Design a protein with these regions (language model features):
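Thiol-based oxidoreductase modules, predominantly thioredoxin-like and allied folds used
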Residues: 2-5, 23, 35-61, 68
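N-terminal leader/targeting and pre-domain segments
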Residues: 1-17
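Short active-site neighborhood of thiol/selenol oxidoreductases, capturing the structured segment around
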Residues: 15-26
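Hydrophobic heptad-repeat coiled-coil signature
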Residues: 28-31
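Structural alpha-helical scaffold elements that stabilize or flank donor/cofactor-binding regions
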Residues: 11-13, 62, 67
Length: 68
């Protein structure tokens, strides 16, 4: 699931499940390599954990706030 700055608090801090946040950028090679792994983990842990992705180029407020 892709999220933005406005949805971050609700999707992450108010989630009833543990959340893994993938902060990524389109220009980031390692991010592109990790994306399919995150997608597989999301399937494997469905119902037990939540996986969200945030494009840091499109959403700078949250990464700046948390030093990412």
């Amino acid at each position: 699931m892709n999220i933005n700055d406005d949805a971050f608090e609700n999707e992450v801090f108010k989630s009833l499940l543990p959340v893994v946040v993938d902060f990524w950028a389109p220009w980031c090679g390692p991010c592109k390599m990790l994306s399919p792994v995150i997608d597989e983990l999301e399937k494997e842990f469905a119902g037990r954990a939540k996986f969200v992705k945030m494009n840091i180029d499109d959403n700078s407020r949250t990464p700046t706030k948390y030093g990412i």
